[in-house]
């Protein structure tokens, strides 16, 4: 059974009785709380974008308040630790899932949807997943490969120095090396078989 088979396709007419759907760390009660909380948010604001515009003066303030809102409302509907996991604290952590969502919504190119028109790409901070952290650590941008807010700011500052108008532009390209090719962002035996080695700045010009 799919998500839409279970809950329906209309956020205002949900079928939430007896759901057994779960996702990774989210138990059925967490999934149910997530759907109900989003439905309530749509009823109050009309869209997630409108909620952001109402919840803060800028996208960062809105993100912080959005997380507080979703955590509080979700807890009232039975959401547990799995639910809270979806809404990482953007003040203390990189909050990669939330920032990936913002990248999709705000940036507009062949990779990202860009359906939110009230924010600019220059407002976005970077997304620090495992691959970006490995790249940044091996490149000397950060001192440890941990997903902290401090490291998020340092990585964003690095890419913003390259492109102040769109610092998150490089996330897809850099992380894709790790996702698709297993890149370690440094000289490694994998470089010997990588099809991108000749154009890669991290390979150290490995000869195959």
Feature annotation, model-predicted:
Residues 1-208:
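HhH-family (HhH-GPD) DNA N-glycosylase catalytic core used in base-excision repair
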